């Protein structure tokens, strides 16, 4: 519901595939896949649409499309991480000037240290690209993607914890 601006009732979209090769019907429940714009409106992002579309590809057995999508997500994610890392130093300097307690300064320092570990992840990503760029075996490449994601998990968990800690210190 609230997906279409002129319709107040829930809606269902049906897509018919004339080149369908089997008798199976794919139904995707996308009720919880959206970005809330305001109280009354929801919107699909480009990533939401890609994720829903890839489900159809997986249903048809085209796993290589899924692996390619994950590669694009990794590339875009690394690009955003590098962009954000460049912004960390100026913002942390401003925070250190404003914060007058030791706890806040320590929290900022821990976040800066966490961002410094991004260099190892960039190296790991470059190794992944070099080793698996031309990989044709879908299972092997997908396994490598899972391992790469696992390498990033501690970075994001620590970053999340650090931001929560900084937020808590600033609010006190």
Task: Describe every region a protein language model picked out.
Residues 1-172:
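A conserved structural/catalytic subdomain of Rossmann-like adenosyl-cofactor enzymes
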């Amino acid at each position: 519901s609230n997906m279409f601006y002129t319709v107040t009732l829930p809606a269902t979209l049906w897509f018919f595939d004339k080149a369908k090769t089997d008798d199976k019907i794919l139904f995707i429940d996308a009720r919880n896949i959206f970005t809330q714009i305001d109280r009354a409106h929801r919107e699909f992002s480009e990533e939401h649409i890609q994720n829903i579309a890839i489900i159809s590809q997986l249903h048809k057995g085209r796993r290589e499309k899924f692996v390619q999508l994950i590669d694009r997500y990794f590339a875009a994610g690394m690009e955003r991480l590098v962009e954000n890392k460049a912004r960390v130093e100026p913002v942390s300097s401003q925070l250190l000037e404003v914060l007058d307690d030791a706890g806040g300064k320590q929290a900022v320092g821990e976040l800066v240290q966490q961002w410094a570990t991004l260099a190892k992840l960039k190296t790991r990503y470059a190794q992944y690209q070099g080793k698996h760029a031309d990989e044709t075996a879908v299972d092997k490449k997908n396994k490598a993607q899972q391992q790469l994601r696992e390498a990033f998990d501690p970075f994001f968990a620590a970053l999340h914890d650090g931001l929560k800690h900084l937020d808590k210190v600033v609010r006190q």
